[in-house]
Amino acid sequence: MTSRRAFLAGLMAVAAPKPSWADAGSPRWLACAREADGAYALFGLAADGADTFRLPLPARGHAGAAHPTRPEAVAFARRPGAFALVLDCATGALIRDLTPPEGMQFNGHGAFTAEGDILYPVEQRATDSRGFLGIWDTAYRRIGQIETGG
């Protein structure tokens, strides 16, 4: 039987506000760019082109994938590349640094499912450039791949 304390704790957890894209300025687009000083960043852009956020990247980025329900984005390295950074766009915090499996590279793009439970980054095998969609779960662990034939 559930105790009153456990019930109230669960109720508070469910009722607590969750971060949303509004917390990150409700960007319309994500874009990777080089700044005037030569640094690279992922930008959130409003409909009028104004920056809603700017998050630094360690090297040249190519594209970003926005999580459909949380203010998170994955910034992918320029193809072929070795980084995909999961960023909290509301706080600027690095959530996770994704590393492709041994012998694989990220290929600049990715997308979440509509529910946000799976991330599909475009990957390629370094030795022969054979293409794959990686399959990464909600904890950003790689759980599989699909060969693309490319």
Specify the residue positions occupied by each region the protein language model found.
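C-terminal segment of N-terminal export signals and the immediately downstream linker at the start
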Residues: 18-45
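N-terminal export signals
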Residues: 1-23
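A short beta-strand motif characteristic of beta-propeller blades
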Residues: 50-56, 93-100, 142-147
